Amino acid sequence: MIIKFQDMQYELISKIKTTVSGNIDLYLACDVKRREEGLYTVACVRDMEIARKLIMVTTKQNVSLSFRDLHASFNADGKYYVIFNYAQGRTLQQALEDGKFNLRERLQIMKNIFAQIFLLNMPECFLYEALRKENIIVDDSLGVRFNYFFTEIDYYWQVQEKELMNRVNGLVHELFARELEKKSSRELMEFALDLDEGCYGYLWDCYV
């Protein structure tokens, strides 16, 4: 199936999923004219009420230019389409299950997650989505990219900084579960405790 809008054409390769609400279908796709540029996640939004809300966070004029993962958005055939860059590779969840990363590598992954979210400067709702361990892709050099699957679309409009901090807290406890359980690193213990107690008001406070 080909989706066309103006001079853009996207070929839908396979279906990723339908969201729990049933209002959004997600597909893996490629640009028909520029297949070498990689893959995309195409979100097909059938519910126009959701589409109207998404317009505020998925159009180029409403988001930061640095949010490069957002490729395009448009109306076509009575539906609203949002196109994101698709990150291929092993998820953080899979990497943690493998248990192959040493402490230094896991610290670097956490640092790269922070660096990437600040670099992209994405809307809070997508940051909340990106900070899920199954949406974080880790490459062989420990670089980090994100996927966007609208997992909790109904909650997007309620996301505040405290929800983002909770997501980061969860990642820290998973990435460094061994060290926290054994109490083998005082710095990590103090950092995790500060997160638990809500000592950081903003994500930037954790990074600096």
What do these predicted regions represent?
Residues 2-64:
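ATP-binding glycine-rich loop module of kinase domains
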Residues 62-67, 88:
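Flexible N-lobe loop architecture of eukaryotic-like protein kinase catalytic domains
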Residues 69-80:
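Short beta-strand micro-motifs within the conserved protein kinase catalytic domain, predominantly
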Residues 96-112:
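Activation segment of protein kinase catalytic domains, centered on the conserved DFG
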Residues 131:
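Hydrophobic HxD+1 residue recognition
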